[in-house]
Swiss-Prot record:
Recorded family membership: Belongs to the WD repeat WDR48 family.
Oligomer and partners: Catalytic component of the Usp12-46 deubiquitylase complex consisting of Usp12-46, Wdr20 and Uaf1; regulatory subunit that, together wtih Wdr20, stabilizes Usp12-46. The Usp12-46 deubiquitylase complex associates with arr/arrow; the interaction leads to deubiquitination and stabilization of arr/arrow.
Name the record gives this protein: WD repeat-containing protein 48 homolog
PANTHER family: WD REPEAT-CONTAINING PROTEIN 48
Segments for region (Disordered): 594-615
Keyword presence, Nucleus: no
Role description: Regulatory component of the Usp12-46 deubiquitylase complex. activates deubiquitination by increasing the catalytic turnover without increasing the affinity of deubiquitinating enzymes for the substrate. The complex deubiquitylates the wg/wingless-signaling receptor arr/arrow, which stabilizes the receptor and increases its concentration at the cell surface; this enhances the sensitivity of cells to wg/wingless-signal stimulation.
InterPro entries: G-protein_beta_WD-40_rep (IPR020472), WD40/YVTN_repeat-like_dom_sf (IPR015943), WD40_repeat_CS (IPR019775), WD40_repeat_dom_sf (IPR036322), WD40_rpt (IPR001680), WDR48 (IPR051246), WDR48/Bun107 (IPR021772)
C-alpha cells in the first residue's frame, strides 16, 4: 500500500493542463517585457502566454525563433539579463521568480517567496543584485551569484526584504551600482530605499494614479516615472521633489526607455503612441510610431538606431528612431534637428490569442474563437485540437454542434494565457461529476443501449499521470498486470500539467512525459491531492450521483391499477428505457425484453413467453414515458430530462402509459434503485 503525504494544512488543490502544440514558436498573447543581449543579438521576450522566447535579431530572415523557455504557467511580467547574459531572471503572475540558464534555456531554480503576482524586477549590474516586487506589497533583494549556484542539495537561499509599502507594487528600478532602488505602486507615490542598508530614505508624491514604469539615472540622482495618469515626471532625489512634468500622452504611460546620457525619454503609452521627448525641453518631441495596441514594453536594438516594442498584441516590432547623424539621442544637442522615424525595421509575428470559448452540452468538446476570428473545436478529454473550422459564424457553429444532452460540468476553461487551460478540481465544479455511456466516443461503440459507464474526470487524470510511478510503492503482484493509464487512450506527452492551490500559488509543473522521472515522481507524491491519488494510484471509482423522481400512471391509462405516486431513486445517468423496463416488469408485471447487456434475461423471457408477440418488443416500444406533457426519448438519461424537460427544482416526475393493451395484475415491485443495481 502506498502512503501518500497529504501536505497537512496546505490549501485545497486543483489540477490544470494546457491544450497546445508541442512547440509554440509564436507568442499567443501580449508580450510584457523585453531584454536584448547586445553581445550576440538575442532578444528575450516575456509573454502573457507564460512562455519566454528567444529571437535572433541579427538575421534578416523572417524566421527569427531560436527557442522557448518554459516553466511558468501564468503571465511572465518582467525579465532581466544578468551575469553578462549568461543568466536570466523572470517574474510571473504564478507568484514565482525563476532563474534560468539563458544560453541553454532551462530553469535552474524557482523562488517562491512572494505570495501574490510578481510584477517587476530591477537589476544592479555592478553588484549582480536583483530585486523583485509584486502585488503582495513586498520587495525582496537577491544575490544573483547565490541564485545561480543553487542545486537540488544546496537549495537554501537568504534574501533581504524592503518593508514599508502599503499597496501593490507595479514598477521597480535600480541604478547599476545598486545604491538606489525605487518602487511605484497603486499608492500613486514613489518610495526610495538604499538597498545596501535596506533602509527607506524617502517617498515622493505627485502622481494621481498608479506608477507603472520607472528608470533611475546611473548616478542615482534622478528618477523618471510614468503613470496611469498620463504624465511623465522627472524627480531630483537630492531635492526630494519633482522637477519636471511632461504631458505628451493622452492615456497612461506604461513603458520608459532612456538615452545613454539620460537626456532623452522614449515613452510607450496606452494611447498606442511611442514618443521621443527631450527631458530638459519637453516641447522638443517627435512621434516614433503609432502601434496597433497599447504599448507594454520598449527596448533598443543592437545599434540603438531603433526600438523594439511590444503591445497587447502578440507581434514584436522594431521601429526606426528619429536621428540626426545617428547621435541625436546621445549627443544632447539642444539645436539638433529631428529626422523622420517611424519606419518598421523588423517584425516578429505572433500568433492568435483565444478570446471566446463555449463548452458544448456533451461536456467533452469546446469551441473557441481567437483574435483573428478563427474558430476551432478542441477535444478536452483527449487534450487535442479536433477540427479547425476557419472564419465561420461562431454562434451558428455552437448551435449546430450542441446536442440535447445534459452532462454536469466537470471542468472549467481559463483563457488568460491565450491558449485553452483546462482546470480540474473538487470545489465549485467536481471533476468526477461526469458519468457517461462508453459510446461517448472512446472505443468504437454504436449501441446506445450499452450498460458500460465511464467517468471523464477519472479517465483524464489517469491519462495525464500515466507515467507516474510513485516512490516507495509496493511492487506489482506477479499475478496482476501493472496497470497504467486508463486503457482507452493517451494524451500528448508534451502537455503541461500544473498542480496549484485553488486561487493561489503554483506547487508543481511538469510535462506528461516527465512524470516518470525520479524527482518529478517524488514531487508528485508530495504535492498531488488525495482526490487525485485515489483514482490514479489506488484506482478507486468515483461515487455515482443519484436523482430522486416520482413515477405515476398517465391520466390516459386505460386500466391504471394504482394512482398513487411512487418515489424512486436512481443513478443520474440511467437512461429512460430502464424506467420503461421498471414500469413494465415491476409495476405492470408484464414480460419484458430488456435492452442489450441483459442477454440471459432476454433469452429467459423469450423462452417463457415465446407465444406472445408483444412480449418480444423492448420495453420502450411498449411503454411511453411523459414528463411535463412531453413524450420522453428512451435514450435520454434522467439528468437530461430534468435539465431540458422538467426544468424545475422539485423532484422529477414521470407519467407512464402503455402503447398497446397488455394484461397485468398491477402490483408494485422493488424500487428502481434496486433494479438499477442489477444492471
Amino acid at each position: 500500500m502506498l502512503t501518500h503525504k497529504t501536505c497537512q494544512a496546505r490549501k485545497k488543490m486543483q489540477v490544470s493542463f494546457v491544450i497546445r502544440d508541442a512547440e509554440e514558436k509564436q507568442h499567443r498573447n501580449g508580450v510584457n517585457a523585453l531584454q536584448l543581449d547586445s553581445n550576440n543579438g538575442k532578444l528575450y521576450s516575456a509573454g502573457r502566454d507564460a512562455i519566454i522566447r528567444v529571437w535572433n535579431t541579427r538575421t534578416e530572415a523572417n524566421e527569427k525563433y531560436i527557442q522557448s523557455m518554459e516553466h511558468h504557467n501564468d503571465w511572465v511580467n518582467d525579465i532581466v539579463l544578468c551575469c553578462n547574459g549568461r543568466n536570466l531572471i523572470s517574474a510571473s503572475c504564478d507568484t514565482t521568480v525563476k532563474v534560468w540558464n539563458a544560453h541553454k534555456g532551462f530553469c535552474m531554480s524557482t523562488l517562491r517567496t512572494h505570495r501574490d503576482y510578481v510584477q517587476a524586477l530591477a537589476y544592479a549590474k555592478d553588484r549582480e543584485q536583483v530585486a523583485s516586487a509584486g502585488l503582495d506589497k513586498a520587495i525582496f533583494l537577491w544575490d544573483v551569484n547565490t541564485l545561480t549556484a543553487l542545486t537540488a542539495s544546496n537549495n537554501t537561499v537568504t534574501t533581504s526584504s524592503l518593508t514599508g509599502s502599503k499597496d501593490s507594487i507595479y514598477s521597480l528600478a535600480m541604478n547599476p551600482s545598486g545604491t538606489v532602488i525605487v518602487s511605484g505602486s497603486t499608492e500613486n507615490i514613489l518610495r526610495i530605499w538604499d538597498p545596501r542598508t535596506c533602509m527607506r530614505s524617502m517617498k515622493l508624491r505627485g502622481h494621481t494614479e498608479n506608477v507603472r514604469c520607472l528608470v533611475v539615472s546611473p548616478d542615482g540622482n534622478q528618477v523618471v516615472s510614468g503613470s496611469s495618469d498620463g504624465t511623465i515626471k522627472v524627480w531630483n532625489l537630492g531635492q526630494q521633489r519633482c522637477i519636471q512634468t511632461i504631458h505628451v500622452h493622452k492615456e497612461g504611460v506604461w513603458s520608459l526607455l532612456m538615452s545613454e546620457n539620460f537626456q532623452y525619454i522614449i515613452s510607450g503609452s496606452r494611447d498606442r503612441n511611442i514618443i521621443v521627448t527631450e527631458m530638459r525641453n519637453p516641447s522638443n518631441k517627435m512621434l516614433v510610431c503609432e502601434e496597433k495596441a497599447p504599448v507594454l514594453s520598449l527596448g533598443y536594438n543592437i545599434d540603438k538606431t531603433g526600438v523594439w516594442a511590444t503591445t497587447w498584441n502578440s507581434d514584436i516590432r522594431c521601429w526606426k528612431l528619429p536621428m540626426y547623424d545617428r547621435c541625436v539621442l546621445s549627443s544632447g544637442g539642444m539645436d539638433a534637428q529631428w529626422t523622420l522615424g517611424g519606419t518598421e525595421l523588423a517584425c516578429i509575428k505572433g500568433g492568435a490569442a483565444i478570446k471566446e470559448c463555449t463548452v458544448l452540452n456533451d461536456k467533452r468538446y469546446i469551441i473557441t474563437k481567437d483574435s483573428q476570428d478563427q474558430v476551432v473545436v478542441y477535444d478536452v478529454l483527449r487534450v487535442t485540437k479536433k477540427e479547425e473550422l476557419g472564419v465561420v459564424d461562431y454562434e451558428e457553429e455552437v448551435k449546430k454542434r450542441n446536442k440535447q444532452v445534459y452532462i454536469p460540468n466537470w471542468f472549467t476553461v481559463d483563457l488568460k494565457t491565450g491558449m485553452p487551460t483546462i482546470v480540474l478540481g473538487q470545489e465549485e465544479v467536481d471533476c468526477f461529476a461526469a458519468w457517461v455511456s462508453i459510446e461517448a466516443g472512446l472505443p468504437e461503440c454504436d449501441d446506445p443501449t450499452t450498460e458500460i459507464k465511464i467517468n471523464y474526470g477519472k479517465l483524464l487524470l489517469e491519462a495525464l499521470l500515466e507515467y507516474w510511478t510513485p516512490p516507495h510503492s509496493m511492487p506489482p503482484n506477479e499475478m496482476e498486470p501493472d496497470v497504467r493509464g486508463n486503457g482507452y487512450f493517451q494524451v500528448p506527452k508534451h502537455t503541461p500539467v500544473i498542480f496549484s492551490e485553488v486561487g493561489g500559488r503554483t506547487v508543481c509543473r511538469l510535462l506528461v512525459r516527465d512524470a516518470a522521472g525520479d524527482s518529478e515522481s517524488t514531487l508528485l507524491h508530495e504535492t498531488a491531492p488525495q482526490w487525485v491519488t485515489d483514482v490514479v494510484i489506488e484506482r478507486n471509482i468515483p461515487k455515482f450521483l443519484k436523482i430522486p423522481f416520482f413515477l405515476q400512471p398517465h391520466p390516459q391509462m386505460t386500466k391504471p391499477e394504482r394512482t398513487k405516486k411512487d418515489r424512486l431513486v436512481a443513478n443520474e445517468f440511467i437512461q429512460c428505457r430502464k424506467v420503461c423496463e421498471h414500469v413494465l416488469e415491476k409495476v405492470l408485471n408484464a414480460e419484458t425484453t430488456p435492452s442489450a447487456g441483459n442477454a440471459n434475461n432476454s433469452l429467459q423471457n423469450s423462452q417463457s413467453d415465446a407465444n406472445s408477440e408483444g412480449s418480444q418488443l423492448p420495453a420502450e416500444e411498449r411503454i411511453e414515458l411523459w414528463c411535463n406533457d412531453v413524450i420522453v426519448d428512451p435514450n435520454m438519461d434522467l439528468r437530461t430530462v430534468r435539465h431540458f424537460i422538467w426544468k424545475q427544482s422539485t423532484d422529477l416526475t414521470f407519467q407512464y402509459k402503455t402503447k398497446q393493451n397488455f394484461n397485468f395484475d398491477g402490483s408494485i415491485g422493488d424500487s428502481l434503485e434496486r433494479v438499477t443495481r442489477k444492471y
